[in-house]
Amino acid sequence: MTKKEMLYEGKGKKLFKTDDENLLISEFKDDLTAFNAEKRGNESGKGALNCKISTEIFHLLEKNGIKTHLVEIISDTEQVVKKCKIVPIEVIVRNVATGSLTKRLGIKDGTVLPFALVEFCLKDDALGDPFINDEHCLILNLVQNEAQISEIKNMARKINSILTPFFDNKNLRLIDFKIELGLTKDNELVLADEISPDSCRFWDKFSNEKLDKDRFRQDLGNVKMAYEEVLKRILN
């Protein structure tokens, strides 16, 4: 497969065309961003860690019936993925209240929610990725119909039901996570983007030590060490 010109560069990855019109190469970057890219940094080796972590998680999800855009991993930082049209919604699943949820609703940080909360954000950096509801999704034509909203929510909850016990077995609490979904050329909804410490909050099961991008957001240090610890636990 030939890697061709860059199609898109985001905060954490670059996408490249290939000699197959239905496949792209996704390259994970070492860049770190927070607060809608107002805070920026770089951690050597982070891209490779996220590539490996996300690949392992996507393989786990595929074995459990979740369809993804992943085809194969071809280097330390590169995956071959199916070309798909990204649904312009960030889907957030929360098991424990922290971050923006506590600020918006006044829920005490660390409160275990009675059930997984699914939230939507509009993918628009200029607007600050605002929170939106089902009706917004329909009015803005972000989804095809109400049935697709239900499909998105059901997929998000199924992913959570697979990952929560998996990580619990690795002595990690899956506090919350963000996913992006895409539509293939056959109009099939698939999990796209990544699932990694960049897009999840992981707390140690016993100490509640943060092992994710919050270490960068909150200037806690040892970002790479935390990502390495997550990968080690996934593989063990």
Swiss-Prot record:
One of its GO terms (biological process) is cobalamin biosynthetic process. One of its GO terms (molecular function) is ATP binding. Pathway: Purine metabolism; IMP biosynthesis via de novo pathway; 5-amino-1-(5-phospho-D-ribosyl)imidazole-4-carboxamide from 5-amino-1-(5-phospho-D-ribosyl)imidazole-4-carboxylate: step 1/2. PROSITE patterns: SAICAR_SYNTHETASE_1. Gene3D superfamilies: ATP-grasp fold, B domain (3.30.470.20), Phosphorylase Kinase, domain 1 (3.30.200.20). Its EC number is 6.3.2.6. InterPro entries: SAICAR_synt/ADE2_N (IPR028923), SAICAR_synt_PurC (IPR033934), SAICAR_synth (IPR001636), SAICAR_synthetase (IPR050089), SAICAR_synthetase_CS (IPR018236). It catalyses: 5-amino-1-(5-phospho-D-ribosyl)imidazole-4-carboxylate + L-aspartate + ATP = (2S)-2-[5-amino-1-(5-phospho-beta-D-ribosyl)imidazole-4-carboxamido]succinate + ADP + phosphate + 2 H(+). Keywords: ATP-binding, Ligase, Nucleotide-binding, Purine biosynthesis. NCBIfam families: purC (TIGR00081). Belongs to the SAICAR synthetase family. This is Phosphoribosylaminoimidazole-succinocarboxamide synthase.
